């Protein structure tokens, strides 16, 4: 299954232009890393504050979307901006389908997955109580409803993280060991572990991994 992610920065107009440029550059750096880790992945920044990602192996779409959300939450922590941006970072929508057309050289993403992720992002963008959406093309309403609730719960966990918790979870999701994270953040390994436990890292990580085990082709069968 192919996935696309459509996302936008919450209340981005509250950022001064210099901070928005800084944030966009951080996102581009993360996308460069994703291109190395997930073959065929590519992403683009649209409309100034929007993001569209093409994920050839859709199982990893949730991990990628959560990492984007964590990055933005951490990066804006010392910026003067709206409280909603500090808390939520981004709202995102994931669409999945068996077929989708994407051409990085021509800057084209087309097909049912991007239609779903884009449409559902538009639907939640006007709300202050929903920050994640998920839909699989041709899946039943009950399956899509269950999976969307699952994705939303994980997104809500990120919303509840402090900045210190968010930066630790960000690096752990990228695969860094606690000693390495401590070196990056300039703190002791014991402090990294404490922040991870207070963020319920074990549960959070298990939920991400369980999502990656789902056979999306079968549930659409």
Question: Where do the language-model regions lie?
Answer:
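Regulatory and interdomain segments flanking nucleotide-handling catalytic cores
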Residues: 1-221
